[in-house]
From Swiss-Prot:
The active site is at T13. The gene is hslV. GO terms for cellular component: HslUV protease complex; proteasome core complex. Na(+) binds at G167, C170, T173. This is ATP-dependent protease subunit HslV. Disulfide bonds: none annotated. Protease subunit of a proteasome-like degradation complex believed to be a general protein degrading machinery. NCBIfam families: ATP_dep_HslV, PRK05456.1. Belongs to the peptidase T1B family. HslV subfamily. One of its GO terms (biological process) is proteolysis involved in protein catabolic process. A double ring-shaped homohexamer of HslV is capped on each side by a ring-shaped HslU homohexamer. The assembly of the HslU/HslV complex is dependent on binding of ATP.
Length: 185
């Protein structure tokens, strides 16, 4: 247990993005845990931004993630159709702003052209193998998706199976999958 939170650490989620076959899919599970207790099983941690042209998913503290989603939405309004630029500007603010620096979350964002992971360290990472995952079960989902990328499975099937595998292994990930899909370049 932390000195700030008598209930322990909040653990939340697995988010994965798969880009394959002219589609980009982002999927996340619905579990939010506080310490050893499942607080909610149907949280929605994947959503559309920027008039539906961008999909975003978050892992970490929920209030912090919503703050970052609002900031990203503002950056997308400032830099329309420039997800990379908006993400870099958000990462710069996140790293240098005294208030934002303390936010504990990670984000995956994608549009028709690019998929990015954004961290509080100022990192904006673009995956090289068509998939990336974050959160407590992120490594399990990522490994599963990488193993399936050469199969004949669709992006949707890969994302769903990867989350299923992560949910089987990670106690902070469940099988309640929310998925958003965009047509990709």
């Amino acid at each position: 247990m932390s000195e700030h939170n008598p209930y322990g650490t909040m653990h939340a989620t697995t988010i994965i993005t798969v880009r394959k076959g002219g589609k980009v899919v982002m999927a996340g599970d619905g579990q939010v845990s506080l310490g050893q207790t499942v607080m909610k099983g149907n949280a929605r941690k994947v959503r559309r931004l920027s008039k539906g042209d961008v999909i975003a998913g978050f892992a970490g503290a929920t209030a912090d993630a919503f703050t970052l989603l609002e900031r990203l939405e503002a950056k997308l309004e400032q830099y329309p159709d420039q997800l990379m630029r908006a993400a870099v500007e958000l990462a710069k603010d996140w790293r240098t702003n005294k208030y934002l620096r303390n936010l504990e979350a990670m984000m995956l964002v994608a549009d028709k052209s690019v998929t990015l992971a954004i961290t509080g360290n100022g990192d904006v990472l673009e995956p090289e193998h068509g998939t990336i995952a974050i959160g407590s079960g992120g490594n399990y989902a990522f490994a599963a998706a990488r193993a399936l990328m050469d199969s004949d499975k669709s992006a949707e099937e890969i994302a769903r199976r990867a989350l299923q595998i992560a949910g089987d292994i990670c106690v902070y990930t469940n099988h309640n999958v929310v998925m958003e899909t965009l047509d990709a370049d």
